[in-house]
Amino acid sequence: MTKIKIVVIVGPTAVGKTALGISLAKALNGEIISGDSQQVYRQLDVGTAKATQEEQEAAVHHLIDIREVTESYSAYEFVQDAQKAISDIVSRGKLPIIVGGTGLYLQSLLEGYHLGGQVDQEAVKAYRQELDQLSDQEVYELLQVKSITIKQLNRRRAIRALELSQFADDLENAETAYEPLIIGLNDDRQVIYDRINQRVDRMLENGLLEEAKWLYEHYPTVQASRGIGYKELFPYFVGEMTLAEASDQLKQNTRRFAKRQLTWFRNRMAVNFTAITAPDYPQVVHDRVRDFLGQKEKS
């Protein structure tokens, strides 16, 4: 089987994945697939660090703004959507470039979960609604009943495991159809932390507070509201924190999230990391991708 070559750009939040993805897409006739669990939601732009309108005009983006904030989204759905996007991009002779920091989503796609038959999406949604009615303890007990074990026990991962088990007949855990080049962006911890702090400040200047308040006033309990960037500001809206305290909490939680992202990518994926402050870093990455694709740079 001839595998489809794809480029995957990963790394901690605020490291510059979007800019690199657009640069590669423009140079190599590519299109971008978002691998971020929060960027699927419409109306949540600032807090999710979604590609701006200008950036989306510079390169075609897929899997952005495909869900309402009231809807849930899972790794299972991402795999299905990403496979369709990859097939579409390749059919038009273009290079799929996946950009994102949600390790679970990317690992699920790259490790070989392929949709064999036609999955009844209404059945998937109905099953998830049933699970949503259960307490955490009941969800964990259901894992035991089905003899399902997961490495790190939390509700979201437990529900994903139950979904995969429930619809196993429609899934083929086969050799992956993709040959990925996984590019990791990173740098010294303080460099990353400084970029995170600066990004949060820019987000607040660019409308994050208004976006978070809209979400808090209308949909405070939905899955989308649990993402980093929104829930940290909720205490400010009810007078439990000052804006400065909420901002500091957001920066701290984002730094912790970046650390978890790096741990995931290092332990679970074959990532070749490049320091973003290294000399000629963009050119080095471009050359690596061209080598992977068997291309020579045009003179």
Swiss-Prot record:
GO terms for biological process: tRNA modification. Signal peptide: none annotated. InterPro entries: Dimethylallyltransferase, IPT, P-loop_NTPase. Keywords: ATP-binding, Magnesium, Nucleotide-binding, Transferase, tRNA processing. It is an enzyme of class 2 (transferase). Its EC number is 2.5.1.75. GO terms for molecular function: ATP binding; tRNA dimethylallyltransferase activity. ATP binds at residues 11-18. Residues 36-39 are annotated as: Interaction with substrate tRNA. Substrate binds at residues 13-18. It catalyses: adenosine(37) in tRNA + dimethylallyl diphosphate = N(6)-dimethylallyladenosine(37) in tRNA + diphosphate. It holds the Pfam family IPPT. Its cofactor is Mg(2+). The record marks 102 as: Interaction with substrate tRNA. Catalyzes the transfer of a dimethylallyl group onto the adenine at position 37 in tRNAs that read codons beginning with uridine, leading to the formation of N6-(dimethylallyl)adenosine (i(6)A). Monomer. Belongs to the IPP transferase family. NCBIfam families: miaA. HAMAP family: IPP_trans (MF_00185). PANTHER family: TRNA DIMETHYLALLYLTRANSFERASE (PTHR11088:SF60). This is tRNA dimethylallyltransferase.
